[in-house]
Amino acid sequence: MTSRGVHLLLRLLFLLAVFYSSDSSLMCYHCLLPSPNCSTVTNCTPNHDACLTAVSGPRVYRQCWRYEDCNFEFISNRLEENSLKYNCCRKDLCNGPEDDGTALTGRTVLLVAPLLAAARNLCL
């Protein structure tokens, strides 16, 4: 690897570190009406540090949530549902329909694309 290539790679890594900070807001699916078909994505506020999926019969709720409030009593009271199953998770878009872990998030693309471009430039 040439000196020029090393400098380019270091600059790219620095830019990635600047743009990819761990304190950036979490992204979750959010549905105004309880529905299994939800494609609306929202950036959570700083005090909402988890994504919630709650299912009560045919109704499916997806939204930003506080992880410390992720318990049956709080969720059922807030959603006014007596019977439900719920899951709270802390990764971007982890509350999507049938999450199989293969979705690429914007942050993943931000990390991978510049590295692939740098590797391509170094090989040419």
Curated annotation (Swiss-Prot):
Any one biological process term the GO annotation gives: negative regulation of activation of membrane attack complex
Carbohydrate attachment residues: 37
Domain called UPAR/Ly6: residue spans: 25-101
Compartments in which it is found: Cell membrane; Secreted
Assembly: Interacts with T-cell surface antigen CD2.
Main location: membrane
Endpoints of the signal sequence: 1-24
Modification comment: N- and O-glycosylated.
Keywords: Cell membrane, Disulfide bond, Glycoprotein, GPI-anchor, Lipoprotein, Membrane, Secreted, Signal
A GO MF term: complement binding
Function description: Potent inhibitor of the complement membrane attack complex (MAC) action, which protects self-cells from damage during complement activation. Acts by binding to the beta-haipins of C8 (C8A and C8B) components of the assembling MAC, forming an intermolecular beta-sheet that prevents incorporation of the multiple copies of C9 required for complete formation of the osmolytic pore.
CC terms in the record's Gene Ontology section: plasma membrane; side of membrane
Membrane topology summary: Lipid-anchor; GPI-anchor
GPI-anchor amidated glycine lipid attachment residues: 101
Name of the protein this chain belongs to: CD59 glycoprotein
Disulfide bonds: 28-51, 31-38, 44-64, 70-88, 89-94
Positions of the propeptide segment: 102-124
